[in-house]
Structures are given as C-alpha cells and as structure tokens.
C-alpha cells in the first residue's frame, strides 16, 4: 500500500433499543441508509470522520482485506466493502448489534463481509499475523486501548494501515505495541479523536 507523508489533519446514544440509520458515504452503495440499533455505548463513526478517513486511504480499497475489530454499527466495515474491499471481517460481541450487522449484510448481499459474534480481543489473538491491509480499531472509550493495540497491531500487513478512534489524542510513544509505527494522519470531530498509523519506513 502507498505510504502517506506525516500530516496534521483538521479536524449520545440512548437506551431505547429502537433502530435508527447510518448512511454509506461513498462507493458502490453510496447514500444507502442502513438501520442500526440505538444502544447505550454504540457510537457509529460520524459521516465527517468516515469521509476524512477514506480520503486518507485513497477513496477505494479494491482487493484489500479489512478488519473492523469492534464493529458496533458496522459503519467502517460497510464503508470499506462499498469501496471495493475483497474481504471485511466485522467482530461484535453484543448479540443484538451483531444481529443487525447480519441483517444489513443480507440486505446488501455483501458476500465479501463476514460477521463474527465474538469478543474482539480473543478473536484477534487467534488470527494469523499480517492478515489485513487495514485494521479499524474503535473500541469503547472506557476499554483498555493498550490491550486492543497489542492484539490488533500484529494483524496489519507490513505496508498496511491501522486506524484508531479514541476519546483522547493517541500518543504512539505511550503504547509499546506502537513502537516502530508512525502517526501519519490525525483529526478530531466533537469528542472523537481519530488517527491513521503506518509502520515507519526503514529504507
């Protein structure tokens, strides 16, 4: 995958359980609305953030393999599939949220998407290293980000990307798993800090 030059980018859910919708920003399913459950703690990645992220990634992900490790609404994974990803593995431990992901997958006839109802950390630890071109990491803000990074980082191919959403700005030097990684893009939208990382070029 191409390297990006380091740069600084500009840049409440209810307990009702009733459905609402996100929309796909670009690609084959552009402007398609997808129902998502309005569950406590479920934070779909905002349209503005997704648009910025996929601009960073070059709009299309043709032929690439992607992992959405804490899928939630599936906003990132469905967006990647819409933009040509050959395989998207979405992992979600919440049964109802995983059920909604499967319903949306069937609605789109998205055969490149695999839904795993499982604990993200445990499943990631069982996957082969270097399996993915892009790993999307958007854990709950109260989760241990260090543990998530420890299992996610080895899954990224040598020239791949790691995307991280968090409740505060990410400092790679503060996380041992990110040793040798470079923060190439970052931004903030509301309470969401978002970051794109790639391994440092040793050439």
Give the residues covered by each predicted segment:
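Class I S-adenosyl-L-methionine-dependent methyltransferase catalytic core
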Residues: 1-203
